[in-house]
A protein has these predicted regions:
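Bacterial N-terminal signal peptides
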Residues: 7-16
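Exposed, flexible binding/inhibitory loops of compact, secreted disulfide-stabilized domains
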Residues: 20-233
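Positively charged n-region of N-terminal signal peptides that target proteins for export
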Residues: 1-4
Length: 233
């Protein structure tokens, strides 16, 4: 499983899922429009046995717009996904202020290769590698369920906190690798099974702090946390 978290390394932090409730696409008195995407965040390290996810990040032009559904269409002739993030525009007086949004777009499992990602106002590219083994992951990853980014007010440095539940008493930490790839910060929380005879199935909550690269300019970055079972959350 992969955990996708969008973070702003600036004066404040923003993490979590899509920030707005979706609206009824048949809502009367509104107009369906395509929202503009400021940037497409693409995690690194997808293989052909992974569920591929990319993140659209942008702004709605004012408070009269509300995020709606999204669509992704693949063109085999160009090798590109055309992604549309729709929004509802309400015909009422509104506040002329930008409204941030971001959306996780699930593209499913893709064969090895390079795929273009095109959205209104932005484009990107996702590389799909060949899996090294027949299983869902290259390593045994911790079953991470939540991730957040915080800043140490004393040192002004950023760190991530990953949380989840071990499901066996013999699960233990081996290491957490940090891969810094520009706009994408990838965490590989690798665990191992202790060689003991008393292993039992039991849920054991964990919380682990990981230092993040702190040499980047202020802005928006994608925190990509690997987790058990080769999917995206």
């Amino acid at each position: 499983m992969r955990k996708i978290t969008l973070a702003i390394l600036a004066a404040c932090l923003f993490v979590g899922s899509t920030a707005f409730a979706q609206v009824d696409d048949n809502d009367p008195g509104t107009t369906l429009v395509v929202a503009e995407t400021k940037e497409i965040f693409v995690p690194n390290g997808f293989d052909d046995n992974d569920e591929v996810v990319v993140v659209l990040d942008g702004y709605l032009p004012d408070s009269c717009h509300k995020i709606a559904h999204h669509e992704a269409k693949y063109d085999p002739e160009t090798g590109k996904f055309q992604v549309f993030q729709f929004a509802r525009r309400y015909n009422v007086p509104c506040l002329p202020a930008l409204v941030p949004y971001y959306t996780e777009v699930h593209l499913g499992m893709l064969p090895q290769g390079t795929y273009g990602i095109v959205s209104k106002g932005s484009n990107g590219e996702v590389e799909i590698g060949e899996a090294n083994n027949a299983g869902p992951d290259d390593f045994l990853y911790a079953p991470v369920e939540h991730a957040r980014v915080e800043r140490d007010e004393r040192t002004n440095k950023y760190f991530a906190i990953i949380q989840g539940r071990f499901t066996n008493t013999c699960m233990e930490w081996e290491e957490v690798k940090v891969i810094n790839s520009g706009k994408s910060k990838e965490l590989l929380p690798i665990i191992q099974m202790a060689d003991r005879d008393d292993c039992q199935d039991q849920e054991i909550p964990f919380s682990w702090m990981v230092d993040l690269p702190n040499d980047d300019a202020a802005g928006r970055y994608l925190l990509h946390v690997r987790s058990l079972n080769g999917k995206s959350v």
